[in-house]
Amino acid sequence: MIDTFTVAGHLCVDLAPELPAELELTPGALQNIGPMRMVVGGSVANTGKVLHSLGANVKANAVVGKDELGTITKKLLSDVGISVESIIETSETTSSYSVVVEPKGIDRTFWHHVGAN
């Protein structure tokens, strides 16, 4: 049986603010929104989380920026039981993230920065 799975590919942090149904995108307007949810995403995280939930040891193989978001990305992976020892940090670009725009009652959209992927 396989002892450890290595998952490789796209890795990002999803930033999902809680949005009201009546959200308006009026230029210059201040909108009151709810708390921010931060979840590690992309194929590395999503596949890794499922494998770990099935009892497998999982090692992530991806690249993040040598920045605060890269540190957060690695912490979020570690928090769900995925090894981050093979993740490469680079100063040549920034870490990947998506802003998940999901007002109540409306299908979500993603505003994405590819970053180190």
Question: Where on the chain are the PLM-derived regions?
Answer:
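Conserved N-terminal subdomain of the carbohydrate kinase-like
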Residues: 29-31, 38, 53-117
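Glycine-rich phosphate/adenosyl-contacting loop at the front of the ribokinase-like
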Residues: 1-61, 71-72, 78
